[in-house]
Amino acid sequence: MAEPIIVKGQKQNAMGVKRKGAEKVRHVAADAEHFEQERLKKPSWIRAKMPTGPEVMRMKAMMREQKLHSVCEEASCPNLGECFRFGTASFMIMGDICTRRCPFCDVAHGRPRPLNPFEPRNLAQTVYNLGLAHVVITSVDRDDLRDGGAAHFAACIREIRRVSPKMTIEILTPDFRGRAELAVQILSATPPDVFNHNLETIPRFYDVVRPGANYERSLHLLRDYKKACPKKIITKSGLMVGLGEEIEEILQVMQDLRSHDVDMLTVGQYLQPSVHHLPVKRYYTPEEFDFLAQEGKKMGFLHVASGAMVRSSYHADRSAQTVL
């Protein structure tokens, strides 16, 4: 699907116009020196498979036919080729335009279009056709909606339960800024099997890395959702490393997650989507990722996936099997 093009005279805030790269992040209050750092050479242990082959083409065609999006494509995930080849994907609902401008993320920013009322049905039919045992549903931030999109998440969960009652469901949500209480109320009435919300980074980086987000608010969302659920729910969060944080700061975030009763953790290497995004300050070694996994297990996480290519939904089906 071709990206909308901004033409001369077109309103910059027109609905449906996608801003990426420099146009997306130019208003983010970040130190210019941070963006202009020379790009580091990727080490030998960071290798992604090319997104080619018949299964990859089949998955993309199916997405287009059902008017669905995957975070794999929209966020330029390096694992797209591997996941699509095995018939798995993380479905991104509520469109492909985000109301936030996080400078680490490659999802487009702009004024989103209205929600597609047929999306829950199309999503449920697609995951049924794929024969998935476990599905991951995420979304763009929708700060334009009264409930932040919580009711649309719930509609997708209900429709998948109706069509595929044995399928386990994992949702990766935004922080529902200013609407978290309402979102928790809506989603606790239609719970998934795994509730995931990523902290992404350490608290001192939030103003630059997650503009519009709040570290404590994200922790409270994870805690409050678990408390509100009428059934046992697994909670999960994810971190990316390599933006200049110290190991001790990562360990403190992990402790904060455990103190808010989070069960599962993913830790992966941040990779710069383009020259316009935040640069990688450091590449972590496999040994450092192993260390973080070991420390996480000591803290009491039920499952820790830690590695350079690990992402929130990477092998999420296998991870879920260990705790559900």
From Swiss-Prot:
Does the record carry Disulfide bond as a key word? no
Recite the UniProt cofactor note for this protein.
Answer: Binds 2 [4Fe-4S] clusters per subunit. One cluster is coordinated with 3 cysteines and an exchangeable S-adenosyl-L-methionine.
Listed CDD domains? Radical_SAM
The UniProt record lists the Radical SAM core domain at: 84-302
Query: Which molecular-function annotations from GO does this UniProt entry contain?
Result: 4 iron, 4 sulfur cluster binding; lipoate synthase activity; metal ion binding
Localized where? Cytoplasm
Q: Domain of life of the organism in this record?
A: Bacteria
Binding-site residues, [4Fe-4S] cluster 1:
72, 77, 83, 313
Q: Name one GO cellular component term.
A: cytoplasm
What NCBIfam families does the record tag this protein with?
lipA, PRK05481.1, PRK12928.1
Q: What is this protein called?
A: Lipoyl synthase
Q: Its gene?
A: lipA
